From Swiss-Prot:
InterPro entries the record matches: NeurotensiN
Subcellular location(s) of the protein: Secreted; Cytoplasmic vesicle, Secretory vesicle
Protein name according to UniProt: Neurotensin/neuromedin N
A GO molecular-function annotation: neuropeptide receptor binding
Signal peptide positions on this chain: 1-23
Matches recorded under Pfam families: Pro-NT_NN
Family: Belongs to the neurotensin family.
Protein backbone atom coordinates (compact mmCIF):
# COMPACT_ATOMS: atom_id res chain seq x y z
CA UNK A 1 0.00 0.00 0.00
CA UNK A 2 2.78 2.43 0.94
CA UNK A 3 4.86 1.43 -2.10
CA UNK A 4 1.93 2.21 -4.40
CA UNK A 5 1.46 5.58 -2.75
CA UNK A 6 5.18 6.36 -3.09
CA UNK A 7 5.09 5.42 -6.77
CA UNK A 8 2.09 7.69 -7.30
CA UNK A 9 3.85 10.53 -5.50
CA UNK A 10 7.01 10.09 -7.59
CA UNK A 11 4.99 10.01 -10.82
CA UNK A 12 3.08 13.12 -9.79
CA UNK A 13 6.29 14.98 -8.98
CA UNK A 14 7.79 13.96 -12.34
CA UNK A 15 4.67 15.13 -14.18
CA UNK A 16 4.68 18.36 -12.21
CA UNK A 17 8.29 19.10 -13.07
CA UNK A 18 7.72 18.19 -16.71
CA UNK A 19 5.14 20.96 -16.86
CA UNK A 20 7.44 23.53 -15.27
CA UNK A 21 5.50 26.38 -16.87
CA UNK A 22 2.75 25.87 -14.29
CA UNK A 23 5.07 26.76 -11.39
CA UNK A 24 5.47 30.40 -10.37
CA UNK A 25 6.58 32.39 -7.36
CA UNK A 26 3.83 34.93 -6.98
CA UNK A 27 0.09 34.50 -6.72
CA UNK A 28 -0.59 36.90 -9.59
CA UNK A 29 1.62 34.96 -11.99
CA UNK A 30 -0.11 31.76 -10.92
CA UNK A 31 -3.55 33.21 -11.60
CA UNK A 32 -2.40 34.53 -14.99
CA UNK A 33 -1.00 31.14 -15.96
CA UNK A 34 -4.16 29.40 -14.77
CA UNK A 35 -6.47 31.66 -16.75
CA UNK A 36 -4.25 31.45 -19.84
CA UNK A 37 -4.14 27.67 -19.64
CA UNK A 38 -7.88 27.35 -19.14
CA UNK A 39 -8.77 29.80 -21.93
CA UNK A 40 -6.45 27.97 -24.32
CA UNK A 41 -8.08 24.66 -23.40
CA UNK A 42 -11.58 26.07 -23.76
CA UNK A 43 -11.09 27.95 -27.03
CA UNK A 44 -8.98 25.41 -28.88
CA UNK A 45 -10.69 23.15 -31.36
CA UNK A 46 -11.18 19.70 -29.89
CA UNK A 47 -11.24 16.67 -32.13
CA UNK A 48 -14.01 14.20 -31.35
CA UNK A 49 -11.74 11.24 -32.02
CA UNK A 50 -8.90 12.15 -29.71
CA UNK A 51 -7.90 14.77 -27.19
CA UNK A 52 -4.44 16.38 -27.32
CA UNK A 53 -2.00 14.57 -25.06
CA UNK A 54 -1.11 17.60 -22.90
CA UNK A 55 -4.76 18.08 -21.94
CA UNK A 56 -5.13 14.44 -21.04
CA UNK A 57 -1.92 14.54 -19.01
CA UNK A 58 -3.28 17.51 -17.05
CA UNK A 59 -6.50 15.56 -16.44
CA UNK A 60 -4.40 12.57 -15.34
CA UNK A 61 -2.37 14.75 -12.96
CA UNK A 62 -5.58 16.10 -11.43
CA UNK A 63 -7.01 12.61 -10.99
CA UNK A 64 -3.71 11.52 -9.40
CA UNK A 65 -3.83 14.46 -6.98
CA UNK A 66 -7.44 13.61 -6.11
CA UNK A 67 -6.43 9.98 -5.50
CA UNK A 68 -3.65 11.07 -3.13
CA UNK A 69 -6.06 13.36 -1.30
CA UNK A 70 -8.68 10.62 -0.98
CA UNK A 71 -6.08 8.20 0.42
CA UNK A 72 -5.00 10.79 2.97
CA UNK A 73 -8.61 11.45 3.94
CA UNK A 74 -9.19 7.73 4.56
CA UNK A 75 -6.61 7.77 7.34
CA UNK A 76 -8.19 10.79 9.02
CA UNK A 77 -10.31 13.82 8.31
CA UNK A 78 -8.28 16.77 6.99
CA UNK A 79 -9.12 19.97 5.22
CA UNK A 80 -7.70 20.59 1.74
CA UNK A 81 -5.08 23.04 3.00
CA UNK A 82 -3.95 20.67 5.74
CA UNK A 83 -3.35 17.71 3.42
CA UNK A 84 0.10 18.86 2.35
CA UNK A 85 1.16 20.29 5.70
CA UNK A 86 0.23 17.22 7.79
CA UNK A 87 1.95 14.63 5.59
CA UNK A 88 5.21 13.27 6.94
CA UNK A 89 8.14 14.71 5.04
CA UNK A 90 11.84 14.45 5.89
CA UNK A 91 12.92 16.57 8.85
CA UNK A 92 15.52 18.49 6.84
CA UNK A 93 13.65 19.92 3.86
CA UNK A 94 15.93 20.91 1.04
CA UNK A 95 15.07 23.19 -1.88
CA UNK A 96 13.91 20.28 -4.02
CA UNK A 97 11.33 19.12 -1.45
CA UNK A 98 10.01 22.64 -0.94
CA UNK A 99 9.64 23.15 -4.68
CA UNK A 100 7.88 19.79 -4.98
CA UNK A 101 5.44 20.74 -2.21
CA UNK A 102 4.82 24.12 -3.84
CA UNK A 103 4.24 22.47 -7.21
CA UNK A 104 1.77 19.98 -5.75
CA UNK A 105 -0.08 22.77 -3.95
CA UNK A 106 -0.30 24.87 -7.12
CA UNK A 107 -1.53 21.90 -9.13
CA UNK A 108 -4.17 21.28 -6.46
CA UNK A 109 -5.36 24.85 -6.79
CA UNK A 110 -5.59 24.55 -10.58
CA UNK A 111 -7.45 21.24 -10.37
CA UNK A 112 -9.93 22.59 -7.82
CA UNK A 113 -10.60 25.83 -9.69
CA UNK A 114 -14.16 26.15 -10.97
CA UNK A 115 -13.10 26.99 -14.51
CA UNK A 116 -11.03 23.80 -14.82
CA UNK A 117 -13.86 21.68 -13.41
CA UNK A 118 -16.21 23.32 -15.93
CA UNK A 119 -13.78 22.51 -18.75
CA UNK A 120 -13.48 18.93 -17.48
CA UNK A 121 -17.27 18.51 -17.71
CA UNK A 122 -17.30 19.95 -21.23
CA UNK A 123 -14.51 17.55 -22.19
CA UNK A 124 -16.45 14.56 -20.86
CA UNK A 125 -19.54 15.68 -22.79
CA UNK A 126 -17.54 15.96 -26.01
CA UNK A 127 -15.96 12.54 -25.55
CA UNK A 128 -19.34 10.96 -24.78
CA UNK A 129 -21.20 12.85 -27.53
CA UNK A 130 -20.28 10.31 -30.19
CA UNK A 131 -21.70 7.43 -28.15
CA UNK A 132 -24.85 9.16 -26.97
CA UNK A 133 -25.77 10.81 -30.28
CA UNK A 134 -27.79 7.88 -31.61
CA UNK A 135 -29.51 7.33 -28.27
CA UNK A 136 -30.55 10.99 -28.03
CA UNK A 137 -31.99 10.97 -31.56
CA UNK A 138 -34.09 7.91 -30.73
CA UNK A 139 -35.40 9.52 -27.55
CA UNK A 140 -36.25 12.75 -29.38
CA UNK A 141 -38.11 10.82 -32.09
CA UNK A 142 -40.28 9.15 -29.49
CA UNK A 143 -40.98 12.29 -27.49
CA UNK A 144 -42.01 14.61 -30.35
CA UNK A 145 -45.79 14.62 -30.89
CA UNK A 146 -47.37 14.16 -34.32
CA UNK A 147 -48.15 17.84 -34.92
CA UNK A 148 -44.61 18.93 -34.12
CA UNK A 149 -43.29 16.31 -36.52
CA UNK A 150 -45.54 17.67 -39.25
CA UNK A 151 -44.31 21.19 -38.63
CA UNK A 152 -40.72 20.07 -39.14
CA UNK A 153 -41.38 19.14 -42.76
CA UNK A 154 -42.14 22.35 -44.64
CA UNK A 155 -42.12 20.74 -48.08
CA UNK A 156 -45.42 18.93 -47.64
CA UNK A 157 -48.60 20.97 -48.07
CA UNK A 158 -50.85 21.00 -45.06
CA UNK A 159 -54.29 19.48 -45.52
CA UNK A 160 -57.25 21.06 -43.78
CA UNK A 161 -58.81 18.89 -41.12
CA UNK A 162 -62.12 20.73 -40.94
CA UNK A 163 -63.84 21.38 -44.25
CA UNK A 164 -66.17 24.31 -44.57
CA UNK A 165 -69.70 23.35 -45.46
CA UNK A 166 -70.90 25.08 -48.47
CA UNK A 167 -74.20 25.04 -50.33
CA UNK A 168 -72.79 22.85 -53.08
CA UNK A 169 -72.06 19.89 -50.74
CA UNK A 170 -75.71 18.83 -50.33
Amino acid sequence: MMAGMKIQLVCMILLAFSSWSLCSDSEEEMKALETDLLTNMHTSKISKASVPSWKMSLLNVCSLINNLNSQAEETGEFHEEELITRRKFPAALDGFSLEAMLTIYQLQKICHSRAFQHWELIQEDILDAGNDKNEKEEVIKRKIPYILKRQLYENKPRRPYILKRGSYYY
